[in-house]
């Protein structure tokens, strides 16, 4: 499950509390499609 592994790594970098903020920024959203879906 590479997608899930990528999501785990992304959430580690971005932080679960920052996910919504990341997804509101186009650059971060593009870098983390697995968490912004």
Swiss-Prot record:
Pfam families: Toxin_8. The record marks 31 as: May play a crucial role for the selectivity for alpha-3-beta-2 nAChR. InterPro entries: Conotoxin_a-typ, Conotoxin_a-typ_CS. One of its GO terms (cellular component) is host cell postsynaptic membrane. Keywords: Acetylcholine receptor inhibiting toxin, Amidation, Cleavage on pair of basic residues, Disulfide bond, Ion channel impairing toxin, Neurotoxin, Postsynaptic neurotoxin, Secreted, Toxin. Disulfide bonds join 22-28, 23-36. Negative results: does not block alpha-9-alpha-10/CHRNA9-CHRNA10, alpha-2-beta-2/CHRNA2-CHRNB2, alpha-2-beta-4/CHRNA2-CHRNB4, alpha-3-beta-4/CHRNA3-CHRNB4, alpha-4-beta-2/CHRNA4-CHRNB2, alpha-4-beta-4/CHRNA4-CHRNB4, alpha-6/alpha-3-beta-2-beta-3 (CHRNA6/CHRNA3-CHRNB2-CHRNB3), alpha-6-beta-4/CHRNA6-CHRNB4, and alpha-1-beta-1-epsilon-delta/CHRNA1-CHRNB1-CHRNE-CHRND. The cysteine framework is I (CC-C-C). Alpha4/7 pattern. Alpha-conotoxins act on postsynaptic membranes, they bind to the nicotinic acetylcholine receptors (nAChR) and thus inhibit them. This toxin blocks alpha-3-beta-2/CHRNA3-CHRNB2 nAChR with high selectivity (IC(50)=8.67 nM (on rat) and 17.5 (on human)). Also has weaker activity on alpha-6/alpha-3-beta-2-beta-3 (CHRNA6/CHRNA3-CHRNB2-CHRNB3) (IC(50)=108 nM (on rat)), alpha-6/alpha-3-beta-4 (CHRNA6/CHRNA3-CHRNB4) (IC(50)=121 nM (on rat)), alpha-3-beta-4 (CHRNA3-CHRNB4) (IC(50)=148 nM (on rat)), and alpha-7/CHRNA7 nAChRs (IC(50)=3000 nM (on rat)). This is Alpha-conotoxin LvIA.
């Amino acid at each position: 499950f590479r997608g899930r592994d990528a999501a785990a790594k992304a959430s580690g970098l971005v932080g679960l509390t920052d996910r919504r903020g990341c997804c509101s920024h186009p650059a971060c959203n593009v870098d983390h499609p697995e968490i912004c879906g």
